[in-house]
């Protein structure tokens, strides 16, 4: 069950990253949040 949750979160994160990547400076903000 835990594995399926991780997979779901990974898919959501991937979609969010793609959307943010289209906006200037969004990837920089994303890196700041990960740190």
UniProtKB/Swiss-Prot annotation:
Which residues belong to the signal peptide in this entry? none
Subcellular location, record wording = Secreted
Q: Which residues carry this modification: Glutamic acid 1-amide?
A: 35
Q: For this UniProt entry, what is the primary localization, expressed as one broad class?
A: secreted
Q: Does the keyword Secreted apply?
A: yes
Residues spanning the membrane: none
Keyword annotations of the record? Amidation, Secreted, Toxin
The tissues where this chain's protein is expressed are given as: Expressed by the venom gland.
Q: List the molecular function annotations (GO) for this entry.
A: toxin activity
Quote the cellular component terms of the Gene Ontology held in the record.
extracellular region
> What family does the entry list?
Belongs to the cationic peptide 04 (cupiennin) family. 02 subfamily.
Name-wise, this protein is Cupiennin-2e
Q: What species is given as this protein's source? A: Cupiennius salei
